[in-house]
Amino acid sequence: MDDPEGTNGVGAGCTGWFEVEAVIERRTGDNISDDEDETADDSGTDLIEFIDDSVQSTTQAEAEAARALFNVQEGVDDINAVCALKRKFAACSESAVEDCVDRAANVCVSWKYKNKECTHRKRKIIELEDSGYGNTEVETEQMAHQVESQNGDADLNDSESSGVGASSDVSSETDVDSCNTVPLQNISNILHNSNTKATLLYKFKEAYGVSFMELVRPFKSDKTSCTDWCITGYGISPSVAESLKVLIKQHSIYTHLQCLTCDRGIILLLLIRFKCSKNRLTVAKLMSNLLSIPETCMIIEPPKLRSQACALYWFRTAMSNISDVQGTTPEWIDRLTVLQHSFNDDIFDLSEMIQWAYDNDITDDSDIAYKYAQLADVNSNAAAFLRSNAQAKIVKDCGVMCRHYKRAEKRGMTMGQWIQSRCEKTNDGGNWRPIVQFLRYQNIEFTAFLVAFKQFLQGVPKKSCMLLCGPANTGKSYFGMSLIHFLKGCIISYVNSKSHFWLQPLSDAKLGMIDDVTAISWTYIDDYMRNALDGNDISIDVKHRALVQLKCPPLIITSNTNAGKDSRWPYLHSRLTVFEFNNPFPFDANGNPVYKINDENWKSFFSRTWCKLGLIEEEDKENDGGNISTFKCSAGQNPRHIRS
């Protein structure tokens, strides 16, 4: 097969080399025929416009036209950008406002347009309703003026940009609307987040017809514990609300559950009494797990316990078909709704309060007020005390009367009766041996101690003052303080000797003690208190009263100085019964005292040595029960009716 013309092989393709062979029909010097005379008609017309001179001018014109078009396009883009920027900060359109109203808590703003053909258009706000976010009337008016001024600027900008062309406004309308929507959404979110609780309270009142804050008493601290809580939750699914009735049983004693529906879903109202006290943080965490909603969608506060209107609300709704009630009704609801409880709550009996303080041996005013107030849930008289406007006066009167009764009762008792009453108020289980072992450890003969202790308790003249002396850390104060604590005696200190009333506690005590007496104290005792050490009658200055004459109770004195042998105070030698403690007080490896002396051990000691101390009396020999009658400060009641 012949090769193709003009190629040098098929395999080379278009990229290969090829040879072109020219066909020569005429050579130089050949004669030219007449038919081919080139000069015959060579007028040059065929060479006209052979070279196109208009190419340069056309290219320049096209470049200038492209540049002008580019400038025009850039101008249009710049105008559109400026217009969009101006309209972005101008007031939103009426449709955008309506969309924002639906999202941002029903803020209704309507606009009225007048004189649209005029150059300067004005917009007036014809309606401004409450937004629900707590704005005052002044703030709403300021917002209205701001929107109006922004609309005026927007109209002016629109009129200025209209000269460029209406096509730019139409092309950027979608972008501008999207730009206007973004800031309105941000504002709506900010208002919603900053007023979450207000929105939830509004939705609750809209659904239930009653304010949630009227049913509760707000707690400022989240750490305050309480057994009764009132809880409202939002956005709960129906299945979760139904399952809550079963899940909450294991945590509560009483539950009152209500569920209503609104545009935010199911709104739950729960009154619950837990098995133990819980704070708000614990309750929020528990309910968030049970309801599957965040803690921000709940409001948790304790209910009002003294509001009769609130109690009636819970009482009436408990009988309706929208409530699910489980457990025993709390006592505060019964107290405020049952007629008999209301009658009883209005009566306060001071004698009942005094009897309670006397029976529980509470004489301090602060303890009386605090402990009696804790009984308000179970004692109607205590509840009436809390409702009284004269609680301070009642507490003061109760404390004064209780102290009067206790003082008179103590004065009417002998030393044996007083020790017996103290033993009755002390628990059993003590051992008297540590006391005896400690005395022997200090080289004190137990029999000699019993003889001296018997005279000491009986108040024998010149034998009613016991001195425990010796070096430091030998257990003198430990031994004396334990005895004073058991017999509920008084302690006087020389530091108050400048006061006229520093001996006043001795007027109400069966036993007294002066601890760590120094040389200056011994001098004062030697000068002014010899009669007191003798056990004779003395005169004591008592505050707000005339001088009181009484027999000084037995005194225990601890000192590092043995005044019974010191020559500086010779007149005290015969008035002091001295016991020396010379050995250091022993402790075990754990730092606990080897000889434990407490109230139980003293009770065992007195029970063991009762007869040897001469505390038995004639009434005890008859074995006819206690010789102290029970005190009653309230009048008895006759349960039977008096017949006419």
Swiss-Prot record:
SF3 helicase domain location is: 444-594
Which residues are involved in binding ATP? G470, P471, A472, N473, T474, G475, K476, S477
Question: GO CC annotations?
Answer: host cell nucleus
Where do we find the motif Nuclear localization signal here?
86-88
Instruction: Give residues for the crosslink Glycyl lysine isopeptide (Lys-Gly) (interchain with G-Cter in SUMO).
Output: K551
Instruction: Please give the residue ranges the record annotates as the region DNA-binding region.
Output: 179-345
Where is the protein found, in the record's own terms? Host nucleus
Q: Return the InterPro entries for the record.
A: Helicase_SF3_DNA-vir, P-loop_NTPase, PPV_DNA_helicase_E1_C, PPV_DNA_helicase_E1_N, PPV_E1_DBD, PPV_E1_DBD_sf, Rep_E1_papillomaV, Znf_lg_T-Ag_D1_dom_sf
Q: How is it modified after translation?
A: Phosphorylated. Sumoylated.
Query: Which keywords fit this entry according to its UniProt record?
Result: ATP-binding, DNA replication, DNA-binding, Early protein, Helicase, Host nucleus, Hydrolase, Isomerase, Isopeptide bond, Nucleotide-binding, Phosphoprotein, Ubl conjugation
User: Catalysed reaction per UniProt?
Assistant: Couples ATP hydrolysis with the unwinding of duplex DNA by translocating in the 3'-5' direction; ATP + H2O = ADP + phosphate + H(+)
**Region of interest (Disordered), ranges:** 146-177
EC nos? 5.6.2.4
Membership in a protein family: Belongs to the papillomaviridae E1 protein family.
Which proteins does it associate with, and in what oligomeric form?
Can form hexamers. Interacts with E2 protein; this interaction increases E1 DNA binding specificity. Interacts with host DNA polymerase subunit POLA2. Interacts with host single stranded DNA-binding protein RPA1. Interacts with host TOP1; this interaction stimulates the enzymatic activity of TOP1.
This chain belongs to the protein called: Replication protein E1
